[in-house]
């Protein structure tokens, strides 16, 4: 199952050249970049681990790509995404986010149904990877 979160998630994986073009676009807009990673990409897990420090005031694409390269080396079996943050007045939010690296095997999710009193039914999204392995060794 292919995880689809963020921009470009329904497209094939971006090449490094395509990632560089997206970074250039973000830098041209004046947005700060950062790299995040996780081994638990649950749809409600919006807070991934920050790789290094946010790249404020970086105007060099190579610096951002270096941080991405280091994250790929260290977190090869996890998910890595790039975020762009617009700090301008009135926005002050993440304006672009896209996955740049993913594990070779993505086990996916399943829906667990629980029946309660009075025909009350709840559904919970569960991860196959969390059931099988402890945190840090899921992929």
From Swiss-Prot:
Protein localization: Plastid, Chloroplast
The keyword Plastid belongs to this UniProt entry's keyword annotation: yes
CDD domains: RuBisCO_small
GO biological process, one term: reductive pentose-phosphate cycle
GO molecular-function terms, A-Z: ribulose-bisphosphate carboxylase activity
InterPro entries per UniProt: RuBisCO_ssu (IPR024681), RuBisCO_ssu_dom (IPR000894), RuBisCO_ssu_sf (IPR036385)
Cell division is among the record's keywords: no
Keywords recorded for this protein, A-Z: Calvin cycle, Carbon dioxide fixation, Chloroplast, Photorespiration, Photosynthesis, Plastid
Cellular component per GO, a single term: chloroplast
Described purpose of this protein according to its UniProt entry: RuBisCO catalyzes two reactions: the carboxylation of D-ribulose 1,5-bisphosphate, the primary event in carbon dioxide fixation, as well as the oxidative fragmentation of the pentose substrate in the photorespiration process. Both reactions occur simultaneously and in competition at the same active site. Although the small subunit is not catalytic it is essential for maximal activity.
PANTHER family named in the record: RIBULOSE BISPHOSPHATE CARBOXYLASE SMALL CHAIN 1, CHLOROPLASTIC, RIBULOSE BISPHOSPHATE CARBOXYLASE SMALL SUBUNIT
Entry similarity comment: Belongs to the RuBisCO small chain family.
Comment field (misc): In this alga, in contrast to plants, the small subunit is encoded in the chloroplast. The basic functional RuBisCO is composed of a large chain homodimer in a 'head-to-tail' conformation. In form I RuBisCO this homodimer is arranged in a barrel-like tetramer with the small subunits forming a tetrameric 'cap' on each end of the 'barrel'.
Quaternary structure annotation from Swiss-Prot or TrEMBL: Heterohexadecamer of 8 large and 8 small subunits.
Listed name of the protein: Ribulose bisphosphate carboxylase small subunit
Organism of derivation: Trieres chinensis
Higher taxonomy: Eukaryota, Sar, Stramenopiles, Ochrophyta, Bacillariophyta
């Amino acid at each position: 199952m292919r995880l689809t979160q963020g921009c470009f998630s329904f497209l094939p994986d971006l090449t490094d050249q395509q990632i560089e073009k997206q970074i250039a676009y973000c830098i041209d807009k004046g947005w700060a970049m950062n790299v995040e990673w996780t081994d638990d990409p649950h749809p409600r897990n919006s807070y991934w681990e920050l790789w290094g420090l946010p790249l404020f005031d970086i105007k060099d694409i190579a610096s951002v790509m270096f941080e991405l390269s280091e994250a790929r080396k260290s977190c090869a079996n996890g998910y890595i995404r790039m975020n762009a943050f617009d700090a301008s007045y009135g926005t002050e939010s993440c304006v672009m986010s896209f996955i740049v690296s993913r594990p070779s095997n993505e086990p996916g999710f399943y829906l667990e149904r629980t029946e309660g009193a009075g025909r009350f039914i709840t559904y919970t999204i569960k991860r196959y990877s969390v059931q099988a392995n402890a945190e840090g060794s899921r992929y």
